[in-house]
């Protein structure tokens, strides 16, 4: 693959947090960064990553970024659906979580498309105020399937 847009190079995004996590616990690497690749050009146009392994309640949070010229073309939907379906192969995953700035209307529309439920807000020390959305794994399977 080529990376002409320099995804995760000029702005490290999740790598700043994920690399130290993997150094501390290499087994957690499977939950981290996946490239989003434009098939026709074999170019990286974004990335997605879980924030870590499922927590003690089985909740699994995800984040993603798509380069601006490729937004609103379905790539985020495809990437999230693929990641969540992959995560369902691990029985410890009970709930999917998605947090987003209340100002990020496109991302809120995306998570509403999937049918996630708004759970409230939290204050993130880096990102500031975030809306919290969740969907139980069994509800996800009922709506979207597992493969």
Each predicted region: which residue ranges?
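Glycine-rich acyl-CoA binding loop
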Residues: 74-77
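Conserved beta-strand-loop-alpha-helix junction that forms the acyl-donor binding cleft
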Residues: 98-108
């Amino acid at each position: 693959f080529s990376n002409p847009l320099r995804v995760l190079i000029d702005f490290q995004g999740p790598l700043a947090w994920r690399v130290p996590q993997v150094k501390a616990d290499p087994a957690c690497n499977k939950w981290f960064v996946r490239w989003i690749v434009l098939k026709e050009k074999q170019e990286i146009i974004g990335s997605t990553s879980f924030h870590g392994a499922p927590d003690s309640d089985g909740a699994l949070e995800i984040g993603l970024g798509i380069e601006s010229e490729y937004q609103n073309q379905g790539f985020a939907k495809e990437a999230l659906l693929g990641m969540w379906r992959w995560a369902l192969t691990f029985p410890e995953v009970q709930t999917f979580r998605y947090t987003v700035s209340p100002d990020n209307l496109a991302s809120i529309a995306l998570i509403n498309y999937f049918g996630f439920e708004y759970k409230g807000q939290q204050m993130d020390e880096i990102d500031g105020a975030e809306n919290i959305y969740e969907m139980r794994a069994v509800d996800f399977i009922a709506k979207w399937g597992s493969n």
